[in-house]
Structure formats: C-alpha cells, structure tokens
C-alpha cells in the first residue's frame, strides 16, 4: 500500500533527445508482464553510474563496471526483472555477457557498449534464452516517450511505476531530465534493491558526470532505507546526451555545474522517495532529520540507527507514541562521546524530549496525533555542532512479512 504515491501520467514524462526506450514480455519469471527493458543511447553520450557495495554483487553489476571502465562509451542498457543473476558464480557472468552480445548484435554495437542490469530472485540461473528472445520486440517498440512503460517493465514487488521529469536552465537554454526507479524491499544505503536511471539532454564531460552521479546518489538513493538489507544488484546510472545545445560542462567550476547538480539531485531524490513511499507494506512515510552534529557522517549515523530500528518502525505502524525507542536508537548509534543531556526530539512540531529527558510540557495525545498521520518528520537535535543529515524511511506492517514470505510463490 503506497503512501501518497500514484503512477505519473505518461504525458507528464519528458522525452530526452538521444534516448529511446522499449520493453518486452519475455516470461522471465511470470507470463504476461513487462519484464525486459531496452534503452538505446545515441553515440557520443556520456554515461556514469554507481553500484551496490554488497560484496556478493550480482553478475550484471560486475559486467557493468567492466564495460564502463573500458572507455568504449555506453550505447545501450538492458534490464530484466524476475531474476537477479546474483549468487550465480562464473555461469552467471557468462550469461550476463551473453546478454550483452545479443543486444550488441541487434543494435550493431560492441558488447562492451552494453550495460546489463537484473533484479529479482537471487541464487537462481538467469533464463537467458527467454530474455534474448524478447529483445527484438523491445527494439521494435523503442521510442523516446516510453518512460512510463519503461518504469513498469522494471517493477518487482513495486505496486506503482516510479518515474518523474524535471527541467533546468543552463546558459539560458532549457534542459530536460527524466528518470525511472524501482524498489520496494531490501532497501538500504549504498545501495539497496534499487535501480535508478536518469537521462538528460545536457552536455557533460563523463568524468564530471561521474562526480554528479555520486553527489546525487549520496543525497537520494543513499539516504533511504526500508528494511536495512543491502541488495546485490543496486545501480544508479545517468545518461547525458548533449542534445540540448548547451556548452559542455567540463569541470565543477563551470557556470552551469551547480544548476545541473541541483536539478539532477532533486530528480534523484524524488525517485528515491517514491521507493520508500512504495516500501513493502508501508503505511507511513517518515523523514528522519538529525541536526546539531559535528559532521554530516555523524548525523547520518544517528538517522540510520533510528530509521533501521524495527522497534521504531513498528511503533509508527501502530501509531503508538512509545518514543523512548527513538532515544534508545540515538544512544546505540555509535556516537561514543555523545552528551545525551544535550539531545532534543520533536515529532513534527511536538517537542517530545528536552535536554535528554521527557519534555515536561509533552502530552502523549499530541504525539499520537502526529503518529496517526501518513507523513511524519522526526527531528533530532544533538546539540554538539552545525552539521545536518536527512534520511527517508517507512514503517513495518504485517504486510511486509506477508509480502516477503510469499515472494517466490
């Protein structure tokens, strides 16, 4: 049950010159559902990405890293759902490379110019013959305005397709950005079962784009959590086609750099928050804001401790203002020299804990009033510095257990 999340209108998603998207129903895991996405990328585009930090990273992640490092330039993306091709060893790597060879043959490009992605069940062999059989159909229906269908084609336990568009102005000219994401469970920073793809018609040097991708990921996909599990397949990739006719951004000091950085990060945040809003069984969307830390990392450490806590998440599901659980999470977050007498806690505008203890003016009915809302902000002030960090998360419901217990059935 998604929290204040609906599918976007297809005509609200902006086509990006130099990017075509096509899909197919290949029967990877289930029949009669979109499960293959093919993205054609114009020659000369810059492409950059960041990937899961899980040591058991999937075969397609390994191949993507190799192909991006080859310097040949990415010309296509292929995504399958229903099977993660993870925990599959050398045979899985061979199947990922076979997929790239099939796409390359279809499009007349080199296999190293294809970036493969998979999402779904781990530890099962990829049915590569079905995937390859679906590629001609995906190639045949590829077009620039297929963003909504593309979002539908990468869904697993998602209940809503996730896509968004935005614009910015660079050197006086309009620039477009469009993107899709997927994910609902096994979501934790760096990165989780999340796939995110954004395309823009801005003109960006590839090395500069890599820095922009890292910045956007740190402030979006690496700032969300659903259940604290880090997946094997997470990937976030940005394509810059250069078709907008703007000057090439070749350094961080370029006058257009900040505007593109902010637009890209804003769109990535929107896509990442859609994942949390569609968290498996979610009924609440929570913003965890920690301020007054000595560093951003310290603030994030505290925010993640609160956001990952099953006791905190189930309290929010029940609308039970058992808010000592939040203070307990702050206490075990690992800030060893934290002076708890300086910690303050708010739920929206309700001041719950003051100077390390219960605020004398706090009334439990006020806390419960906030916790009954679908969207809640938890604000924690550490009182030891000027740094801040924000993490987005959701609650744990009975449906989370049911969805994951039934996932393979």
Swiss-Prot record:
EC number(s) given by UniProt: 2.3.1.35, 2.3.1.1
Locate the site labelled Cleavage: 192-193
Task: Name its pathway.
Answer: Amino-acid biosynthesis; L-arginine biosynthesis; L-ornithine and N-acetyl-L-glutamate from L-glutamate and N(2)-acetyl-L-ornithine (cyclic): step 1/1; Amino-acid biosynthesis; L-arginine biosynthesis; N(2)-acetyl-L-ornithine from L-glutamate: step 1/4
Cellular localisation: Cytoplasm
A single GO molecular-function term is: glutamate N-acetyltransferase activity
InterPro entries from the entry?
A: Arg_biosynth_ArgJ, ArgJ-like_dom_sf, ArgJ_beta_C
Q: Give start-end of the signal peptide.
A: none
Q: What is its main location?
A: cytoplasm
The record lists the catalysed reaction(s) as:
N(2)-acetyl-L-ornithine + L-glutamate = N-acetyl-L-glutamate + L-ornithine; L-glutamate + acetyl-CoA = N-acetyl-L-glutamate + CoA + H(+)
Q: Name one GO cellular component term.
A: cytoplasm
Q: How does it assemble?
A: Heterotetramer of two alpha and two beta chains.
Alphabetized HAMAP family for the sequence: ArgJ (MF_01106)
Identify this protein by name.
Answer: Arginine biosynthesis bifunctional protein ArgJ
Gene encoding it? argJ
């Amino acid at each position: 049950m998604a929290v204040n999340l609906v599918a976007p209108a297809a005509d609200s998603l902006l086509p990006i010159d130099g990017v075509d998207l096509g899909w197919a129903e290949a029967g990877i895991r289930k029949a009669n559902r979109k499960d293959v996405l093919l993205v054609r990328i114009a020659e000369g585009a810059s492409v950059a990405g960041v990937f899961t930090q899980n040591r058991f990273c999937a075969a397609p992640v390994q191949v993507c890293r190799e192909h991006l490092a080859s310097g040949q330039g990415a010309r296509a993306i292929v995504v399958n759902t229903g099977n993660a091709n993870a925990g599959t060893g050398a045979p899985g790597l061979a199947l990922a490379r076979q997929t790239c060879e099939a796409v390359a043959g279809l499009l007349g490009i080199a296999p190293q110019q294809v970036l493969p992605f998979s999402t779904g069940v781990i530890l099962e062999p990829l049915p590569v013959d079905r995937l390859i059989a679906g590629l001609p159909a995906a190639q045949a229906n590829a077009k620039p305005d297929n963003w909504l269908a593309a979002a539908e084609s990468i869904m697993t336990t998602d209940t809503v397709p996730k896509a968004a568009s935005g614009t910015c102005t660079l050197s006086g000219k309009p620039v477009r950005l469009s993107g899709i994401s997927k994910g609902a469970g096994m979501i934790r920073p760096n990165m989780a079962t999340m796939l995110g793809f954004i395309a823009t018609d801005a003109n960006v040097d590839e090395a500069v784009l890599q820095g922009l991708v890292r910045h956007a990921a740190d402030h979006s996909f690496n700032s969300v959590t659903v259940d604290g599990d880090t997946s094997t397949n997470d990937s976030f990739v940005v394509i810059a086609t250069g078709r907008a006719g703007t000057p090439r951004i070749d350094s961080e000091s370029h006058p257009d750099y900040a505007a593109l950085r902010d637009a890209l990060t804003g769109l990535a945040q929107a896509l990442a928050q859609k994942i949390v809003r569609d968290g498996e069984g979610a009924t609440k969307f929570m913003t965890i804001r920690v301020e007054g830390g000595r560093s951003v990392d310290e603030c994030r450490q505290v925010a993640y401790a609160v956001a990952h806590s099953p006791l905190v998440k189930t309290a929010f599901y029940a609308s039970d203002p058992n808010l000592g659980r939040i203070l307990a999470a702050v206490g075990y977050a690992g800030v060893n020299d934290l002076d708890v007498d300086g910690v303050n806690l708010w739920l929206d505008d309700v001041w719950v804990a003051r100077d390390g203890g219960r605020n004398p003016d706090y009334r439990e009915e006020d806390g419960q009033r906030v916790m009954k809302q679908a969207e809640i902000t938890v604000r924690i002030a550490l009182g030891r510095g000027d740094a801040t960090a924000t993490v987005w998360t959701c609650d744990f419901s009975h449906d989370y257990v049911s969805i994951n217990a039934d996932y393979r059935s």
